Amino acid sequence: MLISTFVFLLYEVTALSTAIHVTKSYTHTRTGTSFFMYQKEAFYRGRSSTRQFNNTRSPSGRSASRSSNFSHRSSSRDSFSSNRSYSSSLSRSPEEPLRTILVENLTRNVTKEHIAEIFGIYGLIDHIFMPIYKKSELNKGYCYIEYVYHDQAANAVDKMNNAELDGEELFVSIKRFPFESLHKNHKHYENSYRPSRSQNNSHYNDKSFHRSRYSRARSRSPGSNISEYSDQSPPYHSYRHRP
């Protein structure tokens, strides 16, 4: 009886110790698992936080770089537009008055020397361009005259428009002509003529030259003057200017 009781108690003690050991091991295991889970959760939290930090930082960095690039581009565009507006304002600035006149309806007998002599009355001529035919070397019916001053060109238009030269009515107007292109095209530049300063000064300043060179003849209408060359000039070359 005692033996059976002792065996039963020993069995109970063994079972109790086993239960305590299992409980401790389960507790430790659970604690370790929870600690491991805690560390794992903390690790993933750290990675997510770093990812979140990087994700939140990288767009801002990109946006900052993009904004800086955009601001740089916008500033460059603004400077370009300002320069462009400045150049356009310069190009739109008031230009100088035109000093070039166009003389049309010339007879083929008229030469550049005749034009320089007649139109030199009204001012200092800087350049004359008269296109001519290569074979006949006669003019094509018009010429450009560039004066030194714009008021002289206006005076020539006022006096010589609708005037007669060699029996034909002239049509004189102020026009723009690209004289700079003549220097590039030498063939056309050969047809140009530039009076010397001595000729300009003598024709423009010496009024007695015109009085002796041209003789007053007859008047077709009241208030109009007809002047023609004297016997020293070719008989075909006569001109009548407006009063």
UniProtKB/Swiss-Prot annotation:
Keyword set includes Nucleus: yes
Sequence ranges assigned to domain RRM in this UniProt record: 99-177
Keyword Signal assigned: no
Gene Ontology biological process terms from the UniProt entry: mRNA splicing, via spliceosome
Ranges for region Disordered: 48-92, 189-243
CDD domains: RRM_RNPS1
Function: Putative component of the spliceosome which enhances the formation of the ATP-dependent A complex of the spliceosome. may participate in mRNA 3'-end cleavage. Also mediates increase of mRNA abundance and translational efficiency.
Name of the molecule in the record: RNA-binding protein with serine-rich domain 1 homolog
